[in-house]
Amino acid sequence: MRSSHWSVIEVEHLARAQHGIVSRAQVAEIGVNPRMVSRLLSTGRWRAYLGVIVVPATESVRDIGDATALQLRLGPQSLVSGPTALRLQGIDISDRMLVAWVPRPSMPRLGGVRLLRDDLPRQVREIRGLHLAAPIDALLDTVISVTVPQSRELLDLALQRRWLTADDWFDAVHVRLGRGRAGAARLRRLSLSIAEGTHSDGERRCARLFRAAGITDWVANYV
């Protein structure tokens, strides 16, 4: 039977291939018993984080580590979204909120993470073995997760830096505007702000968008 020492070495070898992160299930499968895990955590050699384990323990985890932790904890059907997914795809925003999408009817709980559960289609990008929401979807998930003032600032920044155009926005939000959808009211308000900024073309696009979503109480050019 393999010794605990060699099992620990194998876990640490696996962690190097997974951006410093291993799941508790992986640790158990390799053969490290719970008592040894507790000892390694208590001595600071390993560190518990987001329901998984950081190996070796570090004070901070980079975006790729966060994404790995979320994927291992939430399963292969989940998507890493929000600011983490944006930064990993080259869009540099400062917010450190952790956001992930999980399919219905799964109901995981994970402290410190905004979990989105819906049946909306999202584009998927695979980067370094991880499933990330494509930039436009990660941006929309961020917009509905942060505070209202932050969402306005983020949208302004995205348009100014040409991370997306007004047309990109309208194309992406139409499936999210149905009544009862998470964040739909906020997305409608932000769509109005874009329409007002782009004048008649934007207002016409916005009107079509709202009609398609069954929203009939909006009036263009209303003052």
Give residue ranges: language-model regions:
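Short, intrinsically disordered, charge-balanced linker/junction segments flanking boundaries
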Residues: 216-223
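Short gly/ser-rich loop at a beta-strand->alpha-helix junction or flexible surface loop bordering the NTP-binding
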Residues: 1-185, 201-202, 207-209, 219
